[in-house]
Swiss-Prot record:
Organism: Rhodopseudomonas palustris (strain HaA2)
EC number(s) recorded for this UniProt protein: 6.3.5.-
UniProt name for this protein: Aspartyl/glutamyl-tRNA(Asn/Gln) amidotransferase subunit B
GO molecular function: asparaginyl-tRNA synthase (glutamine-hydrolyzing) activity; ATP binding; glutaminyl-tRNA synthase (glutamine-hydrolyzing) activity
Family matches, as PANTHER family: GLUTAMYL-TRNA GLN AMIDOTRANSFERASE SUBUNIT B MITOCHONDRIAL AND PROKARYOTIC PET112-RELATED (PTHR11659), GLUTAMYL-TRNA(GLN) AMIDOTRANSFERASE SUBUNIT B, MITOCHONDRIAL (PTHR11659:SF0)
Reaction(s) this enzyme catalyzes, per UniProt: L-glutamyl-tRNA(Gln) + L-glutamine + ATP + H2O = L-glutaminyl-tRNA(Gln) + L-glutamate + ADP + phosphate + H(+); L-aspartyl-tRNA(Asn) + L-glutamine + ATP + H2O = L-asparaginyl-tRNA(Asn) + L-glutamate + ADP + phosphate + 2 H(+)
Biological function: Allows the formation of correctly charged Asn-tRNA(Asn) or Gln-tRNA(Gln) through the transamidation of misacylated Asp-tRNA(Asn) or Glu-tRNA(Gln) in organisms which lack either or both of asparaginyl-tRNA or glutaminyl-tRNA synthetases. The reaction takes place in the presence of glutamine and ATP through an activated phospho-Asp-tRNA(Asn) or phospho-Glu-tRNA(Gln).
Alphabetical list of Gene3D superfamilies matching this protein: 1.10.10.410, GatB domain, N-terminal subdomain (1.10.150.380)
InterPro entries (alphabetical): Asn/Gln-tRNA_amidoTrfase_suB/E, Asn/Gln-tRNA_Trfase_suB/E_cat, Asn/Gln_amidotransferase, Asn/Gln_tRNA_amidoTrase-B-like, GatB, GatB_C_1, GatB_Yqey_C_2, Gln-tRNA_amidoTrfase_suB_CS
Length: 494
């Protein structure tokens, strides 16, 4: 589904150009208070084995019971990915042995997933966009966690995570660079967070990726792929792809062959290393779970969930552009995180004239607020300047009470001291001078005192800026800049 590969996306090798082919399997933890098949809590960070039911521990005779909220969250996610919702799906047993898997199998979905094909439009850093196909989304259980640092001779098992609901979102092999892959994961994370179906916290493991990488000469069939397991940051996903593509190219150019295998990414060294040979589906001996009936629901059930979906990033971006004249870049920045979009929406709601000042408000949110938050290492949720305060500053600019320069001084005062911007402007004498006679007096003084500059300005109109600067300086930055410009042009005959 993706566009033709650009020359800049090709990797130079000793034998010419190579194309990297990438597919991603995203494991997103479902936002739910209980696990997929038990009532145990999903809270992060509890004492080991403090959130484990008899079902999670695979005690004999205990049967799984589906959590309907997890089903709803999977459907919502599928709808957000423009995907086909399957009204009938089946849970299967994926059989393998590992100490953190008490049953000896994982309950997953193989042939009949809850969500079928979809697509995501991804905006890229260079301004282009690409469409990434979604192959499927299915529900499955997470495994537990092995603890190797509790004892020098023993490994312990923590089953708190065992049975937590995951959505595995499988992309088609449509990605052609590490930058595309990172942008895709960012977009997918944003969509899930808008929907409220996954918190997207990669540090806590709520979102992690298995990265499938292969290389080929342009126009040739797909090469043998390797899977890099459990990469837990967007930056590491990019690094893993870059390293693995180079590694495979090196092997092939040296006359070797790529072995299909599972690899791990060593974040400390920035490289991948072999973990085990890659399993095929038949290795897991999938079969329908006899303890669970097929999952069936009506189209009306899906339609009801669809009607309750929030406005998603692409829709919000289009509205910001159409209603407030924002550039695609600025709108993209605002919708990239749900919290920043919510803050901007709150500013719009507080403005006296959002139609007039919506674009100005966006500039202030992106340049002044985000800039200061980044400088101070703070998140927008704890911003010292509230949406209402920022809206008041924008109102003061829009109505001509203060200039942009004074507004920046006011923003700094509100950031450090707090307070109502309108009260501060009155109390500190920060109002812009709009009295034309007062401004004209200053303009006349500047012109009279600089006859040589007047001659230069008449010959070179760009010199007008010097006069504007002098008038603003004399007025303490309070003169209305537009009035100053108009008066100077009239007085100098420009």
């Amino acid at each position: 589904m993706n566009a033709p590969v650009k020359p800049s996306q090709l990797i130079k090798g000793a034998t010419g150009d190579w194309e990297v082919v990438i597919g991603l399997e995203i494991h997103a933890q479902v936002s739910s208070n209980a696990k997929l098949f038990s009532g145990a809590a999903t809270e992060f960070g509890g004492d080991p084995n403090s959130h484990v039911s008899l079902v999670d521990a695979a005690m004999p005779g205990m049967l799984p019971v589906i959590n309907e909220e997890c089903v709803k969250q999977a459907i919502r996610s599928g709808l957000g990915l423009n995907a086909q919702i399957n009204l009938r799906s089946v849970f299967d047993r994926k059989n393998y042995f590992y100490p953190d898997l008490p049953q000896g199998y994982q309950i997953s979905q193989y042939k009949s997933p809850i969500v079928g094909e979809g697509e995501v439009v991804v905006d890229l850093p260079d301004g282009d966009s690409t469409t990434v196909g979604i192959e499927r989304l299915h529900l499955e259980q997470d495994a537990g966690k092995l603890l190797h640092d509790q004892d020098p001779t023993s490994t312990f098992v923590d089953l708190n995570r065992s049975g937590v609901a995951l959505m595995e979102i499988v992309s088609k092999p449509d990605l052609r660079s590490s930058e595309q892959a990172k942008a895709y994961v960012s977009k997918l994370r944003t969509i899930l967070r808008y929907l409220g179906t996954c918190d997207g916290d990669m540090e806590k493991g709520s979102l992690r990726a298995d990265v499938n990488v292969s290389v080929r000469k342009p126009g040739e069939p797909y090469g043998t792929r390797c899977e890099i397991k459990n990469v837990n940051s967007i930056r590491f996903i990019g690094q893993a792809i870059e390293y693995e593509a180079r590694r495979q190219i090196g092997v092939l150019e040296d006359g070797g062959a790529i072995v299909q295998e599972t690899r791990l990414f060593d974040a400390g060294k920035g490289e991948t290393r072999s973990m085990r040979s890659k399993e095929e589906a038949h290795d897991y001996r999938y079969f329908p779970d006899p303890d669970l009936l097929p999952l069936e629901f009506s189209q009306a059930y899906v339609d009801e969930l669809k009607a309750g979906l929030p406005e998603l990033p692409d829709q919000k971006k289009a509205r910001f552009i159409g209603s407030f004249g924002l550039s695609p870049d600025d709108a993209g920045v605002l919708v990239s995180e749900r919290e920043s979009a919510d803050f901007y929406e709150a500013v719009l709601a507080a403005l006296a004239d959002a139609a007039r000042d919506g674009k100005l408000a966006a500039n202030w949110v992106i340049n002044e607020l985000f800039g200061r938050l980044n400088k101070d290492g703070q998140s927008i949720e704890v911003s010292p300047v509230s949406a209402a305060q920022l809206a008041a500053i924008v109102d003061l600019i829009g109505e001509g009470t203060i200039s942009g320069k004074i507004a920046k001084e006011l923003f700094e005062i509100v950031w450090t001291e707090g307070g109502d911007p309108r009260v501060l402007v009155e109390a500190r004498g920060m109002k812009q001078v709009t009295d034309l006679s007062a401004i004209e007096k200053v303009v006349d003084e500047i012109i009279a005192g600089n006859p040589d500059k007047v001659a230069q300005a008449i010959a070179k109109p760009a010199m007008l800026g010097w006069f504007v600067g002098q008038v603003m300086k004399s007025s303490g930055g309070k003169a209305n800049p537009q009035a100053v410009n108009d008066l100077l042009k009239r007085k100098l005959g420009l």
